[in-house]
């Protein structure tokens, strides 16, 4: 059985190869065709409609912390007006505006322990098996670890609803608005990628 490091290296290589092949195929044939458009539209409608255009992220860096081989940049950025996402950016030593590195966004697990969010993949809390962001930073990747809605710093701001109760509340709030949590999660993921793309 491969070690975690060997597994990450092999899956990263496999994912890169797959992405390269998909890019080559995408350049030769359109992703959306007359045949696929109706399904695509139904799927989008079922999720809650089109996502808003990405606006200014208004990033704020809160603090920096040095670790062995990389630094943690605690930050937040705007997802939608009035909704900010706390996140941790892991930057390997030696990476700068002039010496860049590949970047990836990693989300925490979604299996019950709602108090945990970005700090688990960043290697600061929780199960070491899930410290994937820290492992990738040690391999030279810039890693963004954001909090998903209802986790860690994005739990009930009034502190009335805990864990799953707040998640059910948010689920119903989006459903009543004609959307769903998947729509919101995809929007948040898109904004995380917008943040990574905005870096030098």
What are these regions (language model features)?
Residues 35-52:
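Alpha-helix capping/hinge segments and adjacent helical runs
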Residues 1, 21-38:
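C-terminal segment of N-terminal export signals and the immediately downstream linker at the start
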Residues 99-109:
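Short beta-strand element of the alpha/beta-hydrolase
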Residues 56-96:
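N-terminal cap/lid segment of alpha/beta-hydrolase-fold proteins
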């Amino acid at each position: 059985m491969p070690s975690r490091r060997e597994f990450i290296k092999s899956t990263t290589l496999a994912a890169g190869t797959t992405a390269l092949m998909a890019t080559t195929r995408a350049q030769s044939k359109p992703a959306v065709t007359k045949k696929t458009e109706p399904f695509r539209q139904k799927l989008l409608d079922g999720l809650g409609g089109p996502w808003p255009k990405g606006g200014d992220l208004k990033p704020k860096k809160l603090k920096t912390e040095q670790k062995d081989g990389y630094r943690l940049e605690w930050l937040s950025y705007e997802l939608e007006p009035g909704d900010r996402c706390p996140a941790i950016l892991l930057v390997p030593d030696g990476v700068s505006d002039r010496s860049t590195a590949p970047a990836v966004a990693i989300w925490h697990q979604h299996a019950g322990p709602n108090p945990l969010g970005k700090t688990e993949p960043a290697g600061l809390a929780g199960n070491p098996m899930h410290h994937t962001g820290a492992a990738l930073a040690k391999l030279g990747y810039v890693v963004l670890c954001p909090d998903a809605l209802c986790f860690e710093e994005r739990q009930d701001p009034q502190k009335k609803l805990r864990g799953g109760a707040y998640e059910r509340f948010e689920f119903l709030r989006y459903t009543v608005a004609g959307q769903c949590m998947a729509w919101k999660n995809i929007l948040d993921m898109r904004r995380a990628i917008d943040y990574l793309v905005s870096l030098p």
